[in-house]
Amino acid sequence: MAVFNKLFKRRHSVSEEIKKDDLQEEVEATETEETVEEVIEEIPEKSELELANERADEFENKYLRAHAEMQNIQRRSSEERQQLQRYRSQDLAKAILPSLDNLERALAVEGLTDDVKKGLEMTRDSLIQALKEEGVEEVEVDSFDHNFHMAVQTLPADDEHPADSIAEVFQKGYKLHERLLRPAMVVVYN
């Protein structure tokens, strides 16, 4: 019976060890499950925080872009208003230029009385002054520039008249600030 008791004790101690091991494994498994659950619970919180931060960054970027776009729109609008203001008299100037040409032709006629000539000169001068106040000026005719002159005829160049010099002006050209209203019609030495 002593052998039986030894075997029973041994078996009992082995089964207690197995139970302890099982219990330890269960405790470890439970702790691991709890830890995993805690981590899983923490992950969504971090994800929600990260998502909120990402959305905040996205909204901030959208705001900054919209703000920059508004500034660009305001700048372009201001530039357009300035351009409109600067060139507001362009159509009027183009309409007046033929009248100015007619006054020039009338003054070139021979046999005008002094009073008529003086009246035409005063009218011409007042038109020119009004156009100058709006920024309209005559195109210079020193040498030929295809940006401001239209060659209607060419003459052969010689020693006295170098190439690209202007021989005669048929019609004066005008510009409004830097914008050409009408090119000067000229005869050019070529």
UniProtKB/Swiss-Prot annotation:
The protein's name in its UniProt record: Protein GrpE
Provenance organism: Streptococcus agalactiae serotype V (strain ATCC BAA-611 / 2603 V/R)
Record-stated family: Belongs to the GrpE family.
GO MF terms held by the record: adenyl-nucleotide exchange factor activity; protein homodimerization activity; protein-folding chaperone binding; unfolded protein binding
GO cellular component: cytoplasm
Subcellular localization, as worded in the UniProt entry: Cytoplasm
InterPro entries: GrpE (IPR000740), GrpE_coiled_coil (IPR013805), GrpE_head (IPR009012)
Main subcellular location: cytoplasm
